Amino acid sequence: MKISVVIPVYNEVESLRELHQQLTQSLSSFEAYEILFIDDGSTDGSVDLVRLLSETDNHINLIQFHRNYGKSAALSEGFKYAKGDYIVTMDGDLQDDPAEIPNLVRKLEEGYDLVSGWKKDRKDPISKTVPSKLFNFVTRLFTGVNIHDFNCGLKIYRKAVVKTLDIYGGRHRYIPALAGQKKFKVTEIIVHHRPRIHGETKYGGARLFHGFFDLISILFLSKYIQSPIYFFGQIGLFTFLIGLAIECYVLYLKYFMGEPFAKHIALLMLGVLIIVVG
């Protein structure tokens, strides 16, 4: 059995050396493994450091993009070149703990095709956790895949899963849902999540809306052909819930965090617009 660890990297030079050390320790119990760093157009020296590490560790392979294509493209390229029977994905910022890899392997070998991490005790700011909880709830509701953390970077797959997935745009957020549509067995385990130590989060407000449209496309492709009325009814409800959640978030910022409405007027108006569309 061979393990492939696929790690998208975008400007994580401060984390990579320590990540490599932790990976080497965690993977030492496996008879064969490879580490694929997919550099997504980094400009901070990440590529040079990975090349340096590879000089003393022949388990490392580097795939380099010359500009930033996004996480879905990086994962798709990693899946294409991964040679392992099991493929692990994780982020390169040290928030995912490599020590969880043996736990993921054990769960996969219980008969599952994909095991997703669940960051139950998540070490992120509210600007990430609130949208994440909303999208996880709605994705569970509409896809029927009963996991809590669709977008957790730490996952393990059987090779058959990654070779059949079509990942582009922002669809990496919904890989468990895509796998579930193809009748693969999907489950989750609670994993240790760590606060970010180096660099800045790549999370931006735009991801909230990109994720919204990606989920619509997934639902459209899977359900529109079967029942257009049912599909568009779901979309209307989903859109209404998104708008309602945005308004609740703005109210929370106003009455619990003391931030004036004027500071978030664009978000407030967007929430109203989305509710009307729904």
Question: How would you name each of these model-derived features?
Answer:
Residues 174-278:
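Hydrophobic helical membrane-anchoring modules
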Residues 2-4, 34:
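Cell-envelope/extracellular polymer assembly enzymes that use nucleotide-activated donors
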Residues 39-48, 94-95:
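A conserved acidic beta->alpha catalytic loop
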Residues 12-26:
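Short, well-formed alpha-helical segments that are part of the catalytic scaffolds
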Residues 12-15, 42, 71, 97:
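Donor nucleotide-sugar binding loop of glycosyltransferases
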Residues 52, 61-67, 71-81, 86, ...:
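Acceptor/aglycone-binding surface of glycosyltransferases and processive sugar-polymer synthases
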Residues 20, 31-42, 63-64:
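Short beta-strand/loop segment that forms part of the nucleotide-sugar
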